[in-house]
Amino acid sequence: MEKIRIRITGVLLLLAGAIYGQNAQQVLDKTASVVSNKGGVEASFTISSKQYGNTNGTIAIKGRKFHADTNEATVWFDGKTQWTYVKQNDEVNVNNPTAADLQAINPYNFIYMYKQGYAFSMSTSGNSYVVTLKGKDKGVREMVITIHKQTYVPTQIRMLQNKQWTTIKVSNFRTAKLSDSIFRFNPKSYPNAEVIDLR
């Protein structure tokens, strides 16, 4: 009798875990839908890490494209090519970034990564869902995403990369109608910048 009770309890725990995992995926799916707004979205952010310190900036996103601006650099990504203007050096580096590179630069890149071999878990904290993603042999080993329950807007993203945690806090999230031209570097706007092609 005790063995049967233990087995039933074990099955119920497994089922509860599966249902909880489905809920985490549903929350991430809804969040991806919000962030992937057809016209685009804009937000402010603060990035904190022991390795790089703190950086504030703004980001505009439309599909896989993004444009980020901080005091140190401006980044354009058109879905394939990335241009990074380093303000201090007046130079533009051009490359085709990897998924891990994009995650380090675009905090919302998780909306494409979470379906690729990550295990989910979820808890709640006040008016937020807290979704944890863990993956083996990934550039980003773990992500903890805090998502507002009513709006499904991500308000904080923590990433574990190379044994270092980076925290990204997001504010002023809003939908927008963004032109594709803002996601490409315009050399006319930076006539004196040195362009270094790393592709």
Give the location of each predicted region.
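Bacterial N-terminal signal peptides that target proteins for export
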Residues: M1-T9
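N-terminal leader/targeting segments and the immediate start of mature chains
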Residues: E2, L15-G53, R64-K65, D90, ...
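Hydrophobic helical h-region of N-terminal Sec-dependent signal peptides
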Residues: T9-L15
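Short, exposed beta-strand/loop patches in secreted or surface proteins that constitute
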Residues: V34, G57-I61, T74-V75, Y118-T124
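Short, hydrophobic/aromatic-rich segments at coil-to-beta transitions
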Residues: G39-S44, K62-A68, S125-T132, T151-Q156
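An acidic-aromatic
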Residues: N56-A104, Q161-T167
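Flexible, surface-exposed loop/linker segments and immediately adjacent secondary-structure boundaries
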Residues: P97-N127
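Non-transmembrane domains of secretory- and envelope-associated proteins
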Residues: S125-S128, G135-E142, Q150-R199
